[in-house]
């Protein structure tokens, strides 16, 4: 244990408080404080520690002269968190040297290190004349600069006047501190399945597996996404077993350009042109590298299920999401999209086989850029789609957006292919109190599969406005109008004008196109209006509205989607009223759903200091009505269990009836577990005619230089916790995440290019484990697997009473273990606390600079000491 870490534990403990690994030399701080107080009137003179304040015999006190210079620590190298002007900079080993009588010890920081933290070295006279590896005398060279080491927090606080700092944005973290992570392989798996027993329609089985694998080498990230699906039913002979490869790509960041290079399968940004999947190469700006103060969307999907239903989401022809949801309103906000744009097709398949299908627009908000900021993308490759009727057309695309003074932004782009050419130009304006508006036009020349040539234009308006005084947030109002000759690039990749086929005894024949086709180039898009608004009502209520209206050339049929909801709370009682409407151009009639949800936590009836497990439970009621006469009512209870609240449950029962379906009782029960090695869920639902069992497991596997670590599903950027010896330690602020039997864990997500705090809960450490530092800070790059290391000392906690020449060792003497690197300070009566000690060994003691001011003590402990919380021992130091 380093001296610095010992002082940390001294500051956070009381006397002989031994709850969780900390016995402190509390008397050191107490008596030293008294010494300071006694000398306060002599503030104009040098501080002096009179040993007689500590003991009558001056020989019973170690040499404390270093405290006279304000040194809580001797000179040396210590790992500290560096903060500059209250902003975190880095965690690193810093060498501290002896300063003058007022400074105590001072940090040794080089010119390059200070420059990386934002110091404008050219503005400091004489600094650029120093050698590259020289220690900069910061407090003397920079006027009004300070450097203070907070021993208890292991934190080096630097302050430098703004006049000497480079002009950097708030929240700026120097790229030198970005961590590309370790070399490692990863695998994400998500398996789900269900079995349905239908008294009328027979039995059916469905399974789905999503595998996301990857390899990190240096700054390069290799990723692959593959899915497998299986279904069988009594209605059809045999079963369908299908593997589908989604994409594979290699990428890395280009830090000087604040950009990202992608090779392989990727997607274009949907800010100017419609987003498309490609196979090729792309170099594009990555605004995540900018600080939050310089940064300007996957959509949240709302829906309502009549019963326990399977929700599938497609984007650009690929299945990107699959889940089973209970009856009533649901929200999906964790989509792993195959691209950053492209409308999402949501299918809700009920247990009786009926389906709802609607489209969620996926596009960006107005394209304003900060003054002087440029965002670009350059893409070359071939078009990719999950639709076999689309060809792999080669293309080139470039886009550029640039911020001008006075809130103006200009932008544009081009798409070029053999049968398609498009050019876009637009302008945006921040209109202050009136909101933000952008307008652009695209001119396109297209050749369709029938070799017909078309010229057309498409004009788009986007508007965004927040009315803070009224609580209204108009998140997006968009309108696009296209002439009859306008087609987008994807339209020209089809091999035929329409793709509707039916299977007959004579084989495949071409029939008259209908709107059951997913595409028909005879009916190209005309006008589209979309709106998203949220309104705050008072302090506890929110109203949201979202919808879209799409018209086509050549037909009066339209696509319509509308959703509305009211969320409110009365004390701790929450209720939600929601409505949805979906009408597809190819579908007769429309789907509508009205739902009400009420949730009352059991804590509403419990005392605030109740320890009952029911304080984590709630009662619920839900009602849904499809406005065609069918209604479902459910009541039940849901909540969490276990110490970490990582087992959630829900039990609902009720009645469904009316409309076209049968009437009778209905209900469901689910269990969801989030553990250190992955997640699992199981559920069961029933009605009079249908019974359904659904289940799933998901998790992540990380293969690294120190072995294989299992965890919860991994996001793009993750943290590997390395604390060998600290098994089963909980990671703070994470549900179900604990270190494994070796002391490793995976924090399944982290924010790239931002400071991430990783901490272990010391209350969950074993009794024979101590941590030098329970907190680590990391700044990962995108896609990185960064390591947060914690040094765990495993061994016996020992309260040793040391004597020398039949007298207690001097107060304040330094004690160091030769084998465990543990150290401590002698308190009263020769007592010292040491942790992580072996059964047998020796300790070295030093209490001055004289030749006879040191000794060595050997000790031997009985085996049962390994099971004791604290072992006490007396030894003679010779």
From Swiss-Prot:
Tell me where it resides.
Answer: Cell outer membrane
Question: GO cellular component terms?
Answer: cell outer membrane
The Gene Ontology terms for molecular function here are:
fimbrial usher porin activity
| A Pfam family annotated for this UniProt entry | PapC_C
Keyword Mitochondrion included in the entry's annotation: no
Task: Provide the GO biological process annotations.
Answer: pilus assembly
Question: Would the keyword Iron-sulfur turn up in this protein's UniProt record?
Answer: no
Q: Which Gene3D superfamilies match?
A: 2.60.40.2070, 2.60.40.3110, 3.10.20.410, Outer membrane usher protein FimD, plug domain
Q: Which residues form the signal peptide?
A: 1-45
Show the disulfide pairing. 855-877
The protein's matches in InterPro entries, at most eight in alphabetical order, are given as:
Fimb_usher (IPR000015), Fimbrial_membr_usher_CS (IPR018030), FimD_plug_dom (IPR042186), PapC-like_C (IPR025949), PapC-like_C_sf (IPR043142), PapC_N (IPR025885), PapC_N_sf (IPR037224)
* Membrane topology classification: Multi-pass membrane protein
Keywords for the protein's UniProt record, in alphabetical order: Cell outer membrane, Disulfide bond, Fimbrium biogenesis, Membrane, Signal, Transmembrane, Transmembrane beta strand, Transport
* Main location (coarse class): membrane
Q: What does this protein do?
A: Involved in the export and assembly of FimA fimbrial subunits across the outer membrane.
The record's comment on protein family reads: Belongs to the fimbrial export usher family.
Instruction: Indicate what this protein is called per its UniProt record.
Output: Outer membrane usher protein FimD
Give the species. Answer: Escherichia coli (strain K12)
């Amino acid at each position: 244990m380093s001296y610095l870490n010992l002082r940390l534990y001294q500051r956070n403990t009381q006397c002989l408080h031994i709850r969780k690994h900390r016995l402190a030399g509390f008397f050191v701080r107490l008596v030293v404080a008294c010494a300071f107080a006694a000398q306060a009137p002599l503030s104009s003179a040098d501080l002096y520690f009179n040993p007689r304040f500590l003991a009558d015999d001056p020989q019973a006190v170690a040499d404390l002269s270093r405290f006279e210079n304000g040194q809580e620590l001797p000179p040396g190298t210590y790992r500290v968190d560096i903060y500059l002007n209250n902003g975190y900079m880095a965690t690193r080993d810093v060498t501290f040297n002896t300063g003058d009588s007022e400074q105590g010890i001072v940090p040794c920081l080089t010119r390059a290190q200070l420059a990386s933290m934002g110091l404008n070295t050219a503005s400091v006279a004489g600094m650029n004349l120093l050698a590259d590896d020289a220690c900069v005398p910061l407090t003397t060279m920079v006027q009004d600069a300070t450097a203070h080491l907070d021993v208890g927090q292991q934190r080096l606080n630097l302050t430098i006047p703004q006049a000497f700092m480079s002009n950097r944005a708030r929240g700026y973290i120097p790229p030198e501190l970005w961590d590309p992570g370790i070399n490692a392989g990863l695998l994400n798996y998500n398996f789900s399945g269900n079995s349905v027993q239908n008294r009328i329609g027979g039995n059916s089985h469905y399974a789905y597996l999503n595998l996301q694998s990857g390899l990190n080498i240096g700054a390069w990230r290799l990723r692959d996404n593959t899915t497998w699906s299986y279904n069988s039913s009594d209605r059809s002979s045999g079963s369908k077993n299908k593997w589908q490869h989604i994409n594979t790509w290699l990428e890395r960041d280009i830090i000087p350009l604040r950009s990202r290079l992608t090779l392989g399968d990727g997607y274009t940004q949907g800010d100017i042109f419609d987003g498309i999947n490609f196979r090729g190469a792309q170099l594009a700006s990555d605004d995540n590298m900018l600080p939050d103060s310089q940064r300007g969307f996957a959509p949240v999907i709302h829906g309502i299920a009549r019963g326990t239903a399977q929700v599938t989401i497609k984007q650009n022809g690929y299945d990107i999401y699959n889940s089973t949801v209970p009856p009533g309103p649901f929200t999906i906000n964790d989509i792993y999209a195959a691209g950053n744009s492209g409308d999402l097709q949501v299918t809700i398949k009920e247990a009786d086989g009926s389906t709802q299908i609607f489209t969620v627009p996926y596009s960006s908000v107005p394209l304003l850029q900060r003054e002087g900021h440029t965002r670009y993308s350059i893409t070359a490759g071939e078009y990719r789609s999950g639709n076999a009727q689309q060809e792999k057309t080669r293309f080139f695309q470039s886009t550029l957006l640039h911020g001008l003074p006075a809130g103006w932004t200009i932008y544009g782009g081009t798409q070029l292919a053999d049968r398609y050419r498009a050019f876009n130009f637009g302008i945006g304006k921040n209109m202050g109190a009136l909101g933000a508006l952008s307008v652009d036009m695209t001119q396109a020349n297209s050749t369709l599969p029938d070799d017909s040539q078309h010229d057309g234009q498409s004009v788009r308006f986007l508007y965004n406005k927040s009315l803070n005084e009224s609580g209204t947030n108009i998140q997006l109002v968009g309108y696009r109008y296209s002439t009859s000759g306008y087609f987008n690039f994807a339209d020209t990749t089809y091999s035929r004008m329409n793709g509707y086929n039916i299977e007959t005894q004579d084989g495949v024949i071409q029939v008259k196109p209908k709107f059951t086709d997913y595409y028909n180039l005879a009916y190209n898009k005309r006008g589209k209006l979309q709106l998203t608004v949220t309104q705050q009502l008072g302090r506890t209520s929110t109203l949201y509205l979202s919808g879209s209206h799409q018209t086509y050339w050549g037909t009066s049929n339209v696509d319509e989607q509308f959703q509305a909801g009211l969320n409110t709370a009365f004390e701790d009682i929450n209720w939600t009223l929601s409505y949805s409407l979906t009408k597809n151009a190819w579908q007769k009639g429309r789907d509508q759903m009205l739902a009400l949800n009420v949730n009352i936590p059991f804590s509403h009836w419990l005392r605030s200091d109740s320890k009952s497990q029911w304080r984590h439970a709630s009662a619920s009621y839900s009602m849904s009505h499809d406005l065609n006469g069918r209604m479902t009512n459910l009541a039940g209870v849901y909540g969490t269990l276990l110490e970490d609240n990582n087992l959630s449950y829900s039990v609902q029962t009720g009645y469904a009836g009316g409309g076209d379906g049968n009437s009778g009782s209905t209900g469901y029960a689910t269990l969801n577990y989030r553990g250190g090695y992955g997640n699992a869920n199981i559920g069961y639902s029933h009605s009079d005619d249908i019974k359904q069992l659904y289940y799933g497991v998901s998790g992540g596997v990380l293969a690294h230089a120190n072995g294989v670590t299992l965890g919860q599903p991994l996001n793009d950027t993750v943290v590997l916790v390395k604390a060998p010896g600290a098994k089963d330690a909980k990671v703070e602020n994470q549900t179900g995440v604990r270190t494994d039997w070796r002391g490793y864990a995976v924090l399944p997500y982290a924010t790239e290019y931002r400071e991430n705090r990783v901490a272990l809960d010391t209350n969950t450490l074993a009794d024979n484990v101590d941590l030098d530092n329970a907190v680590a800070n990391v700044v990962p790059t995108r896609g990185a697997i960064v390591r947060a290391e914690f040094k765990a000392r495993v061994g016996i906690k020992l309260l040793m009473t040391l004597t020398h020449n039949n007298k207690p060792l001097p107060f304040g003497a330094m004690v160091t273990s030769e084998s465990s690197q543990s150290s401590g300070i002698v308190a009263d009566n020769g007592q010292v606390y040491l942790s992580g000690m072996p059964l047998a060994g020796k300790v070295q003691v030093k209490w001055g600079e004289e030749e006879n001011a040191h000794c060595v003590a050997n000790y031997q402990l009985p085996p049962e000491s390994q099971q004791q919380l604290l072992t006490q021992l007396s030894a003679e130091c010779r």
